[in-house]
Each structure stands twice: as C-alpha cells, then as structure tokens.
Amino acid sequence: MAVIVRRPGPPLSGLVTAIVYRAGEQPQTSVEKILPSPETGLWVNLNRDEFRSFDQAGASRGVAGAMLAGPTSRACLIEFEQGHAHVSVTFALGAASRFAGPSLPEARDELVPLETLWGRSGACLRERLLEAATPADALEVMETVLLRQLTGTLALDPAVAAAARALSRGAGVGEVSRDLGLLPRTLRRRFTAQVGLTPKRFARVQRLQRLVRDLDGHARADWAAMAARHGYADQPHLADEFRDLAGVTPGEYLRSRVNGPNHLRPGGAGPAGAACG
C-alpha cells in the first residue's frame, strides 16, 4: 500500500485540504455503501478510465475516470477496485465552488466528469497524471491544474462559512439565520451556491456524521443517550433519520461497517442506497 499526501501552498492552501495519491490498499473489488457527506472531492482513477456506481436494483452506471464527486444528501453505492490506484483532491468546505463554479449545486449526489466542468483540461487530466514519472510528480501536476482552474470571481462568503460552523455544531437553521441577520431564503440561496446542500440538509448530514464518529470503535450503543447527545428529539427520531439518510437501521449500521465509520457493506432493510450520479 502506498499513500502520498501533498499539502498545497497559497493560494490553494485555504481552499484545498489535501492532494493524495493512494495505491494498493483494496485487497479485492467490492461495492460499498458510502454515508452522505457535505464534502466535495475530485477523483482520478489511475487503473481505468471509469468509476462505477450502483442503484438499489444493482444496475451500474459508469462515469469518466476523472470526475468531481459532489456533496451527498443520501447514502450511495460505489465500486472499489482491487489494487485501486487514484489521485484525489479534498476541498475545504465551500471552496469547491471556486473550481466548479455555478455548477456545484447541480453536482449534489452526482459524479460529474471533469470534461463537463473544465473542457479539454478536464478530459486530458488523467492522461497527464499517468505520464508523470512518479506519484509525487503526479501530485505536483494536479496542483498545477488546480491553480489554472481557480477562478477569482467567486469569493468565499464569510456568512456561509459562519453558518457552516454553527450548523456543524448543532445550531438550528432559524437560529443561524437570526444570528447572521439574514432572511432564511437568503441564507439558503447563498449557502447552497457554495456548499451544494441546503442549510437544513447540511445540518441533518452533519448531525449524522457527528453520531457515526461518536460510534466509531463501538460494537454496541445506548441509542437513547446518543439521541439526546446529538440533538435528536428521541430514539425513534434518531432511527428515522438514520434510515432516511443512511438507508439502514442504527443496529444494521453497527453490523455492516467496513473501512471506517462512513463505509458499509451493502444490504439490510430499508432503502439500499442510491447511485451517486
């Protein structure tokens, strides 16, 4: 297994969390359910020019091997190849709009080919990475491409950043709107444009993320206590939210985790998850 991480300098340092090369950590090809996340990422498959996702019925959908994975509002099913090698970019929350532009809200729950966003530069990116002499060189190429795609016309919105921090801590959307002096519809418009999710959906996804991080490493849970700790009305409310966002019951989640808190073996009762894209 090989993992190389590059932390870009200014002006990307506040926009890109990391550029990462990974290879050889997948022992066999498998399909995994991925929990919803507000993060937006860029992925380039170095094994083949394709990524694959699956719907509830098992039908697969392919997308080009260089793509933007938008924020997700529900669980999705993705194939991970044996010996998978890829380059990925993790954007700081709200920063992907500087690279995806006004297309970011349309990328929600989608895998978007980079050619669609960047034209020829996106279409040729995978080939350029494969031509790099070393993985470290490939990461340098990726940083250079990001610099060229960076647009200065979409400044990060301080109100959106403040709202995201408050919502991530568990504040309500109405409370955040009042504290920022914004009408709810104004906050919704500005927040969705830069994050890709509405404030309400973002808050629900972040609450689920706080919950699963709290559960990480535990085989059992006191669900009533977890509901109270993470802002659910009661245990049934927690269970309903879990099924709606993750497609499994809380108990099924504990039994099906693989590779960290956000990856599950497909199956279980309830919606099986939707295809990303």
Predicted regions and their residues:
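Hydrophobic alpha-helical segments, especially transmembrane helices
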Residues: 186-189, 205
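A glycine-rich, hydrophobic loop/mini-helix early in the fold
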Residues: 246
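DNA major-groove recognition helix of helix-turn-helix
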Residues: 191, 203, 241-243, 254
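Alpha-helical bundle regulatory/interaction domains
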Residues: 1-184, 194-199, 213-218, 222-233, ...
